[in-house]
């Protein structure tokens, strides 16, 4: 009984705050992340001295995405009696079973969007502090981080290393 009440409460919270369905939550998350990335690009190009403004927009967007992630995760856990008992993070098969639930897929996507945006914001700041060209940051680092986060991180690390090395 308490589990069904919690599940209904979480579902109502998600519907009220995030959308009528998990698909709508997914779409809203994408739109919000796009806004966050666009703001990050514009501020990186034109607001070199506005680090706080750039950081706050990216962090607020990531915070909202994180809250949506938390609601979906709690909703899944509250309704997990229907989930496979073999679903876990200890094996590839277990993770595959977890991702059969659309709430988990959407939560995973929101997790990806939030973290990559936070990493993109941080890489932008690090590159600016180390004198990496904004053209490289906006033209290469941010798109790579958006599409393939770890690749953007590696690219940025190489750019910063080369920039520091060339200064000596």
Model-derived features: where do they sit?
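N-terminal chloroplast transit peptides
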Residues: 1-12
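Hydrophobic transmembrane alpha-helical segments in integral membrane proteins
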Residues: 13-35
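N-terminal signal-anchor/start-transfer transmembrane helix
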Residues: 30-50
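Loop-to-helix transition at the N-terminal end of transmembrane alpha-helices
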Residues: 50-71
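Transmembrane alpha-helix/helix-exit interface in multi-pass inner-membrane proteins
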Residues: 66-87
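Short aromatic-rich membrane-water interface segments that cap or initiate transmembrane helices
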Residues: 94-107
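Hydrophobic alpha-helical transmembrane segments of multi-pass membrane proteins
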Residues: 107-114, 143
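Hydrophobic, aromatic-rich membrane-embedded alpha-helical segments
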Residues: 138-161
